[in-house]
Amino acid sequence: MAQAQSPLQWLATKLIRGYQIFISPILGPKCRFHPTCSNYALEAIRLHGFVKGSWFAGKRVLKCHPLHPGGEDPVPPKNNRCNK
């Protein structure tokens, strides 16, 4: 069953999708990582919520520059503290 999105998650998702549809094709492929930074942000916000997901996405975007080697960098899994 799908979890309901908060209004901030919904807004962030729409802004990122707008970037992917309208801006990214103009700029061309430049991301050094897989998944791309925008797909990483979508997944992080979906999995961890707006605040923590935005934190992960911001850290990832700051790493995306020519001096970083890039490569495979998946979203960290959500820790379920109730099961520990």
UniProtKB/Swiss-Prot annotation:
<keyword id="KW-1003">Cell membrane</keyword>
<dbReference type="Pfam" id="PF01809">
    <property type="entry name" value="YidD"/>
</dbReference>
<comment type="function">
    <text>Could be involved in insertion of integral membrane proteins into the membrane.</text>
</comment>
<comment type="similarity">
    <text>Belongs to the UPF0161 family.</text>
</comment>
<dbReference type="GO" id="GO:0005886">
    <property type="term" value="C:plasma membrane"/>
</dbReference>
<keyword id="KW-0472">Membrane</keyword>
<protein>
    <recommendedName>
        <fullName>Putative membrane protein insertion efficiency factor</fullName>
    </recommendedName>
</protein>
<keyword id="KW-0997">Cell inner membrane</keyword>
<dbReference type="InterPro" id="IPR002696">
    <property type="entry name" value="Membr_insert_effic_factor_YidD"/>
</dbReference>
